[in-house]
Amino acid sequence: MRCPKCQHNKSNVIDSRQAEDGNTIRRRRECDACHARFTTFERVEEVPLLVVKKDGTREQFSRDKIFNGILMSAQKRPVSSEDIENAITRIEQNIRRNHDGEVDSEVIGNLVMKELADLDEITYVRFASVYRSFKDVDEIEELLQEITKTVRAKKESKK
């Protein structure tokens, strides 16, 4: 593993443990040359997932694309990067479990919306307003009524 500081290609593993998602190994390393410490992550290389877009084209599944979409919707909201990463991990696991190498972009969008509904209502509404491409205010109002019912039901179940 190449050191990010001096580019030397020899390092020693100081600590190794399983990351929270259970699918990744987190390793602390120390460079043999400059003694800088850095973290690496190791995960199993899985069969690539292909996303089938609305126009029929296919592209490789991208965690970064989902992360950036959620991050934009979560600006100035109490949603951490870790929350987003965990949600994306659940989405990807769901897709790998239930689809054979290809998944429609609509399925991914719906899974993201489901995760965001549980994570933060405002982030959910922001994401939905872009994802669903609302045509008028009435469609937004329907979404707000839907999320309001869900939030009230959650509050009632906690009592």
Curated annotation (Swiss-Prot):
Q: Which GO terms describe its biological process?
A: negative regulation of DNA-templated transcription
Zinc finger spans (unnamed)?
3-34
Q: Which domain of life is it from?
A: Bacteria
What keywords sit in the KW lines?
ATP-binding, DNA-binding, Metal-binding, Nucleotide-binding, Repressor, Transcription, Transcription regulation, Zinc, Zinc-finger
Question: What GO annotations for molecular function exist for this entry?
Answer: ATP binding; DNA binding; zinc ion binding
Pfam families cross-referenced by the UniProt entry: ATP-cone, Zn_ribbon_NrdR
Task: Give me the ranges of the annotated region Disordered.
Answer: 1-21
Required cofactor(s)? Zn(2+)
Cofactor, free-text remark: Binds 1 zinc ion.
Q: Which residues form the ATP-cone domain?
A: 49-139
Protein role:
Negatively regulates transcription of bacterial ribonucleotide reductase nrd genes and operons by binding to NrdR-boxes.
Kindly give the HAMAP family that the UniProt entry links to this protein: NrdR (MF_00440)
The family annotation for this protein states:
Belongs to the NrdR family.
Q: What is this protein called?
A: Transcriptional repressor NrdR
